[in-house]
Amino acid sequence: MAKKGMINRELKREKTVAKYAVKRAELKATIANVNASDEERFEAMLKLQALPRNASPVRLRNRCGLTGRPHGYFRKFGLSRNKLRDTVMQGDVPGVVKASW
């Protein structure tokens, strides 16, 4: 089980990313716009740099929904490999069976 502080930190980052997503997209579009003047593009770069670090989606980390484990994460299920195996063996995940051949 991951520390509760780490799990809460990730949740806080997700909220921050969602809060600034539109503003970041607008600034990045201005920077990428070749028709904008150099001054406008430079101002947009400065504004983008002034945003909080945790507003960048690159800083997000996928974590297991049950334990908070950061490694061995399956996006389709939102669980780490350990908890996914446990839930599949209990029959809680429909349509998934243990492989045998």
Swiss-Prot record:
Top-rank lineage group of the source organism: Bacteria
Pfam families registered for this protein in UniProt: Ribosomal_S14 (PF00253)
Assigned keywords, A-Z: Ribonucleoprotein, Ribosomal protein, RNA-binding, rRNA-binding
Gene Ontology CC annotation, any one: small ribosomal subunit
InterPro entries: Ribosomal_uS14, Ribosomal_uS14_bac/plastid, Ribosomal_uS14_CS
GO molecular function: rRNA binding; structural constituent of ribosome
GO biological process: translation
Record's function text: Binds 16S rRNA, required for the assembly of 30S particles and may also be responsible for determining the conformation of the 16S rRNA at the A site.
PANTHER family per the UniProt record, alphabetical: 30S RIBOSOMAL PROTEIN S14 (PTHR19836), SMALL RIBOSOMAL SUBUNIT PROTEIN US14M (PTHR19836:SF19)
Quaternary assembly: Part of the 30S ribosomal subunit. Contacts proteins S3 and S10.
Record-stated family: Belongs to the universal ribosomal protein uS14 family.
The protein's name: Small ribosomal subunit protein uS14
Classification of source organism: Bacteria, Pseudomonadati, Pseudomonadota, Gammaproteobacteria, Moraxellales
